[in-house]
Each structure stands twice: as C-alpha cells, then as structure tokens.
C-alpha cells in the first residue's frame, strides 16, 4: 500500500467532523496568510513552495506548486525558490556547526545562542576546506538575483529560516532582506506563510492518520 497518493488528500475535509472548530479556524488562518497583502499571491505561493520542500510534505508541494503555476510563476522561478530552501536547510546544519565547535572546546557559557558565535563559522574553512568552499559557492549562487530578485529570495530565506528554526539564519537573512529593501510588513507576511505551511504540513498528514486508523 502506498502511503502517499494524491487521492488521500481528498480526505482532509473529514477532519471537520472530528475537530470542527480547530479545522475551521485553521482554514481561515491559512487563507489569510496566503492572501495578497504587501506581498502578491504569486510571491507568497513561491515562499510556500520553498517552505513545503523543507517540511517535506508531498501534499503541500503538489498543492503550492500548482498554485504558484496558476499565479504565473515560471519553472525557473519555482526552481529558484526550491534552491533557496535547499541552501537554507543545509545552511541551518552548517550554522549550528559553531555550537558543535563550542561543545567540543568545552565552552562553559550557559548561553547556547550568541550572535558572536556565528563568527566561528569560518573555522570550517580550515577544518574541511573543500566542502566549506563548495557550500559557500552553492549558497551564494542560490541567493543571487536572477529570475527572482534578491529581495524576493531573501524573503523566501527568512521564511525558510523560521521553518528550520535556525536563530543564526533568522538574524542573517532578516538583515539581508532589510538591506534588499523589504519592510517589516513584507517580512511579517513571509513569516506567516511559513507558519501556515508548518501547520499545514501537520494537518495534511492527518489523511495518513485517517488511513491508518481505518486499517483493520
């Protein structure tokens, strides 16, 4: 039995019978988070595509790539959004490498997250130079303006950073988005797309729970 089929997503409305208030309130929130505001629906759907690739929800990927296409996103724009997500997911792992360095060195500081720790990242250039250099090249090219602007990519990065929960990445890309011309309203809207997609990933997988529950 396949655990993922498009048709399973059709069971989602069944949740309305079992948790009606929560279901309706989520649908209302999700609709508002993805509606046009300072950011267009197209921009929000591209953010949603990126976040869906981080949550790993196949239902969300299918839905939001379709929505992005309906809102005139090109293959190239969708691909660029996905690569921002790829860079941010990988970047979250690398960024937390500074915590590993602190732990290895026996840093007794009770504060596990300080902005100053991020400066240790360059130490990986000496520890694993070729891999570090290759990642930096990939990260730089993924965030470089092309079919999507630098501002659009940094807003996607902000949403992705909130999805991975990387404090260093949130700090870096929020500042980058601001430098690229994003205002606080646009940044907030990008964050709420991430919030909706993280919640949506959990809800979407409820159809798998329904299938599992119904098995004899």
Residues of each region from the PLM?
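Hydrophobic alpha-helical segments
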Residues: 1-216
């Amino acid at each position: 039995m396949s655990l993922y089929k498009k048709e399973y997503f059709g069971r989602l409305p069944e949740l309305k019978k079992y948790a009606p208030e929560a279901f309706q309130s989520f649908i209302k929130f999700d609709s508002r988070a993805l509606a046009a505001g300072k950011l267009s629906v197209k921009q929000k759907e591209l953010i949603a595509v990126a976040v869906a690739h981080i949550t790993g929800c196949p239902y969300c990927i299918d839905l939001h790539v379709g929505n992005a296409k309906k809102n005139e996103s090109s293959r190239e724009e969708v691909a660029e959004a996905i690569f921002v997500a790829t860079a941010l997911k990988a970047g979250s792992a690398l960024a937390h490498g500074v915590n590993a360095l602190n732990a290895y060195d026996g840093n007794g500081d009770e504060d596990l997250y300080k902005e100053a720790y991020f400066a240790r990242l360059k130490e990986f250039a000496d520890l694993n130079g070729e891999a570090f250099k290759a990642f930096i090249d990939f990260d730089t090219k993924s965030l470089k303006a092309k079919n999507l602007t630098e501002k659009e990519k940094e807003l996607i990065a902000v949403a992705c950073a909130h999805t991975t929960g990387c404090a260093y990445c949130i700090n870096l890309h929020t500042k980058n988005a601001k430098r690229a011309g994003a205002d606080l309203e646009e940044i907030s809207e990008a964050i709420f797309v991430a919030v909706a997609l993280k919640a949506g990933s959990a809800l979407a997988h409820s159809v798998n729970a329904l299938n599992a529950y119904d098995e004899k």
